[in-house]
């Protein structure tokens, strides 16, 4: 089977770096899909739908490729949180998150243009947050990192200091579950090692 190019339909530097770390050099094509069009209350369905819409938006740019779309949200106390709109929202969220836990959902959509197949799945990881002082919350938000991330934290950045533990897939919290990607590729007839560079 011919190995197609791997396209990441995401502007997320964390997802790109994660793939590069494990030997996959993706072609990056950020999706311009308007996420506000999708309003779903169930986090797993929301992230799967958004991931698929992102991948489908990028797919027409290619004739033969694997197009990977992803989307992440943090579900906490029955509410769904994407990226905070501003510093005030990030501070308010961290005042609730600190000392608490939430479930980080990431939707994964992989379109195989050659086989005309799409596989869409989600992964969830429980994240336990540390107790934090107001000073620590303000300092963390001042780094700007929480404004760029679903759930207002990055486990691979400054936010790692404030994550006590996780239950589930670590790479999922970064924004792309590597074990789930391996399973999806296998379902399409590929071995993940085919994409190593």
UniProtKB/Swiss-Prot annotation:
Entry's family note: Belongs to the Maf family.
Entry protein name: Nucleoside triphosphate pyrophosphatase
Reaction(s) this enzyme catalyzes, per UniProt: a ribonucleoside 5'-triphosphate + H2O = a ribonucleoside 5'-phosphate + diphosphate + H(+); a 2'-deoxyribonucleoside 5'-triphosphate + H2O = a 2'-deoxyribonucleoside 5'-phosphate + diphosphate + H(+)
Protein location: Cytoplasm
Cofactor requirement: a divalent metal cation
Species classification: Bacteria, Bacillati, Cyanobacteriota, Cyanophyceae, Nostocales
Function noted in UniProt: Nucleoside triphosphate pyrophosphatase. May have a dual role in cell division arrest and in preventing the incorporation of modified nucleotides into cellular nucleic acids.
Pfam families: Maf
List of catalytic residues: 71
Enzyme Commission (EC) number: 3.6.1.9
Superkingdom of origin: Bacteria
NCBIfam families found in the cross-reference section: maf (TIGR00172)
Keywords carried by this UniProt record: Cytoplasm, Hydrolase, Nucleotide metabolism
PANTHER family documented for this protein: BIFUNCTIONAL DTTP/UTP PYROPHOSPHATASE/METHYLTRANSFERASE PROTEIN-RELATED, BIFUNCTIONAL DTTP_UTP PYROPHOSPHATASE_METHYLTRANSFERASE PROTEIN-RELATED
GO cellular component annotations of the record: cytoplasm
CDD domains xref list: Maf
Gene Ontology molecular function: nucleoside triphosphate diphosphatase activity
GO terms for biological process, alphabetical: nucleotide metabolic process
């Amino acid at each position: 089977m011919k190995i197609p190019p791997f396209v990441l339909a995401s502007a997320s530097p964390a997802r790109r770096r994660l793939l590069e770390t494990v030997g996959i050099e993706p072609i990056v094509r950020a999706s311009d899909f308007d996420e506000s069009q999708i309003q779903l209350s169930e986090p797993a369905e929301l992230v799967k739908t958004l991931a698929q819409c992102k991948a489908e938006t990028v797919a027409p740019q290619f004739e033969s490729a694997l197009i990977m779309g992803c989307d992440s949200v943090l579900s906490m106390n029955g509410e769904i949180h994407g990226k905070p709109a501003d510093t005030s929202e990030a501070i308010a969220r961290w005042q609730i998150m600190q000392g608490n836990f939430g479930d980080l959902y990431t939707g994964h959509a992989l379109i195989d243009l050659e086989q005309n197949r799409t596989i869409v799945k989600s992964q969830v990881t429980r994240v336990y947050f540390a107790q934090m002082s107001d000073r620590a919350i303000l300092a963390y938000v001042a780094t700007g990192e929480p404004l760029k991330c679903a759930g207002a934290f990055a486990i691979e950045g400054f936010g790692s200091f404030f994550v006590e533990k996780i239950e589930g897939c670590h790479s999922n919290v970064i924004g792309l579950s590597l074990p789930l990607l391996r399973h999806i590729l296998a379902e399409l007839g590929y071995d993940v090692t085919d994409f190593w560079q």
